[in-house]
Amino acid sequence: MKILVVDDFSTMRRIVKNCLQEIGYTEIQEADDGNTALPMLQSGSFDFLITDWNMPGMPGLDLLKAVRADAKLAKMPVLMLTAEAKREQIIEAAQAGVSGYVIKPFTAATLKEKIDKILATKAAA
C-alpha cells in the first residue's frame, strides 16, 4: 500500500513515517502541504492519505475537500492528524468526508488501529 504523509513540520512527517514503518508499511512518500500533495496524489498511484489539519498554503481540510471533489481520488481513504480535539473540527472533517481522525500525540499502535479500521470499512463498502 502506497501512503502519502502530508505535514508542514518535517519532524512530524518523520514520526508518522517511523510509526508506519514500525507497523509494516514501507511505501511512504511525503509532502509539506496540500499544494504540494494534491498534484502528487493526482499523478501518483497512492492508496492512502495521512494529512495534518493545520498547514500553511492549503490546510488539511482543504486538501480533504479537493480529494473528495476529484473523481479519480474521491474514494481514497484519508486519515486526518491534528493537535486539536475540538468537536466543531471533528464534525467539519466528518462532513467533508474524512475516513478517520487521530489526535496528536499518538502511538504506532493507535495509528495501526485507525488505519486497520479505515481499511476494513473500505473493504466492506
Task: State where each predicted segment sits.
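Two-component signal transduction core modules
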Residues: 28, 49, 101-102
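Two-component/phosphorelay signaling modules centered on CheY-like receiver
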Residues: 10-29
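Acidic, metal-coordinating helix/loop segments flanking the phosphotransfer/catalytic sites
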Residues: 30-48
